């Protein structure tokens, strides 16, 4: 119900410092050394958070049938002076507004339940910034929280994991 031809879908993931992401690259030759390193599936980034965010985004984009112009991806919740995964959500929203995009739907796939990062950072602070930048409508999709289908699915997963233990 949130998407239409005049809406841009922004996937906002929790950010991580680059130093944390680089630790996963056992080769020490891929992460942040190869252009678009998170977009390339290889052994060096098999456990990479950025790669998993990218794969999740592309899977949803494909299922929704979106064009490249209809979506983008960013990272939020930065702290301190260290370098973090990019682009930052606020910077990405500013870029979108500067490109003439006035209607944005934000989804935060890394968050299962709403908390400060979604309720405060996205739904309040980002919305205020977006409107000040000249945007018109920003919708933040609620997290799964206690949605019946999510709880049923989680219960099913837990039961499958417990069955071998309790059998």
Where does each model-flagged region fall?
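Extended amphipathic ligand-handling, pore-lining, and cofactor/metal-binding catalytic surfaces
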Residues: 1-167
């Amino acid at each position: 119900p949130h998407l239409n031809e005049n809406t841009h879908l922004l996937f906002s993931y929790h950010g991580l410092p680059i130093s944390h992401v680089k630790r996963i690259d056992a080769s020490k030759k891929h992460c942040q050394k190869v252009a678009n390193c998170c977009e390339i599936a290889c052994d060096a980034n098999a456990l990479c958070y950025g790669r998993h965010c990218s794969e999740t985004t592309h899977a949803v984009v494909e299922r929704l049938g979106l064009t490249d112009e209809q979506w983008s991806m960013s990272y939020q919740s930065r702290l301190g002076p260290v370098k973090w995964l990019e682009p930052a959500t606020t910077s990405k929203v500013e870029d979108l507004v500067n490109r003439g995009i006035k209607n944005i739907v934000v989804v935060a796939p890394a968050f299962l339940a709403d908390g400060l990062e979604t309720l405060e950072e996205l739904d309040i602070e980002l919305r205020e910034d977006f409107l000040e930048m000249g945007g018109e409508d920003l919708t933040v999709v609620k997290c799964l929280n206690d949605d019946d289908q999510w709880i049923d699915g989680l219960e099913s997963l837990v039961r499958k994991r417990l069955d071998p233990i309790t059998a």
